[in-house]
Amino acid sequence: LILERGLKITWSCNARADVPLDLLQLMKKAGGREMCVGFESASPEVLKNIRKGVKNTDKAIEFVKNARKANLLVHGCFMVGNPGDTRETLRMTLDYAKKLSPNTAQFYPIMAYPGTEAYREALESGALQTKDYNQWLDKDGFHRTTIQRGELSSQDLVDFCDKARREFYLRPSYILRQGIMSIRNPKERYRVFRGFKTLVKHLFRKHGELNTLARQAPTNKE
């Protein structure tokens, strides 16, 4: 319809990780800019537990390659704290995110909102630690979680997401790729710069919290 009406617009959308190349190319021709995809996890068991439509990680990798061929950006979403998650599956998911290497990625712990299946599952399994909604966000408005999975505490899940962001975005290969894209595509330069500022702010926020804790910690002199 966009092509038929000759609309000159730029748009982004959510997408499954199995959109074929010919459709991706058509989406680009119609003004598509970015696909937001919920890859979520590298664990087949976890993907099955949360009823993801695309459980084949190889197919997802092929999708990202095809999106690049179509000159479309990919924003990857990864969620931890799902049923079946362990320290091993979290590590697998981070490695998977690096292998996929979407243009941008977000790592967040699961947010089990009341009225959702995730909330019901967490309540029935005992994974939900509190019903206090104030615990869902920290003082700066960043996501926390009220879910605990086995040996993984809610703080473990939050800490992993912070670690995942650092490992994903501070890779030399990623920084180089983003720099090249900014040079080749001036339209994306501002978005890349803005994203970098947000990342640095987040990293310094975490660093500041650690420094505060260090100053508050008792010393031998005390």
Predicted regions, residues:
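A structural motif corresponding to the C-terminal lobe/cap of the Radical SAM core domain
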Residues: I2-P186, A214-K221
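Short linear elements at protein peripheries
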Residues: V192-E222
